[in-house]
Amino acid sequence: MNATPYRMTPDVIRSVVQKYRPGAYILGDENNGQLIFRYVGRSDCCLQTRLLTHGLLYHCSYFIFSYTNTAKGAFELESKWWHDCKNSGMNLLNIIHPDSPTGSSLLCPYCHFQNGIKKY
């Protein structure tokens, strides 16, 4: 994943994350020069507000993020990052799979693919 880590402070969040944009994010901490991922999440409508009100705001030192155009895109990116982290053996704080956006019946494209494989 090629993304710039930013300090997880309200001032930094306000200066680098635009309002009213959906997207996904990863919160983490630094250990020996590496960003250790701790939490994968998303916002379906305002990434800035989600980060500013996050329960881990003062518990994780860094965040990375990416905007998406839609809530569906945010869900799919969050799901991808969550699966990538889990498949790499990372010990995330959020162990429960990302939920689909409110009012939607979207399925995770990564779980759905695996569930669709026929077993012989």
Protein language model features and the residues they cover:
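Boundary/linker segments flanking structured domains
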Residues: 1-37, 42-120
